Design a protein with these regions (language model features):
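Positively charged n-region of N-terminal signal peptides that target proteins for export
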Residues: 1-5
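Bacterial N-terminal signal peptides
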Residues: 7-16
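Acidic, contiguous N-terminal accessory segments
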Residues: 20-163
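Hydrophobic faces of well-ordered beta-strands that scaffold small-molecule active sites
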Residues: 166-170
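A conserved hydrophobic secondary-structure block that centers on an alpha-helix together
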Residues: 171-183
């Protein structure tokens, strides 16, 4: 009797342990919404005052400036921005007309970051992904502690929207909101 219970207990515990082992490493990179494809790399890219954002045109520059402002405010340094020559930077914006609207490809290595998108929305969403990968101190309104490492993990990400629209759900059964407030 005790032998049967012991065998059942060992079988039960081993099935629990086997079910808990997950070789998928993508859960180590917390991103919302989950990108279509994530391939972790090795190492980290470190942002600093020497980081250069290289963009192809003024539309991309506008997107980059809003992201650079986060570093100015929270990190106390301002990465540089060059417009017109996307090959002369550590963070490079490259237009890829084959990608869908709002889609992007993000390749992060210890030496550089390459962002490919077909439009400004794609570059914006790629930078929002980078923003999530940065330490939470990037959201502060004042300069953070000097010990913060402004780095992101090396990773390759491909993403595109699953749907052609963005939506907002108003749960009118719980909160009665006047029409004027919604609009």
């Amino acid at each position: 009797m005790t032998r049967t219970i012991l065998i059942l207990l060992i079988g039960f515990l081993s099935s629990i342990v086997a079910g808990c082992s997950d070789t998928n490493l993508t859960h180590d990179i917390p991103l919302v919404p989950r990108p279509a494809q994530i391939v972790p790399g090795s190492g980290n890219y470190l942002f600093s005052g020497k980081t250069v954002f290289a963009v192809e045109n003024e539309e991309q520059a506008e997107v980059a400036r809003s992201f650079i402002a986060l570093f100015t405010r929270a990190a106390g340094f301002t990465p540089k921005l060059t417009v017109g020559d996307a090959e002369k930077g550590n963070v490079r914006f490259q237009t890829d007309a084959t990608l869908k609207s709002e889609a992007y490809t993000l390749q992060v290595s210890p030496k550089e970051i390459i962002i490919e998108a077909s439009d400004a929305k794609g570059f914006f969403y790629a930078l929002q992904t980078i923003r999530q990968l940065l330490p939470a101190s990037i959201e502060k309104e004042e300069v953070s502690d000097k010990k913060v490492k402004w780095s992101i993990p090396a990773v390759s990400i491909q993403d595109e929207p699953r749907f052609g629209y963005r939506a907002l759900l108003l749960d009118a059964s719980r909160f009665f909101i006047p029409k004027e407030n919604v609009l």
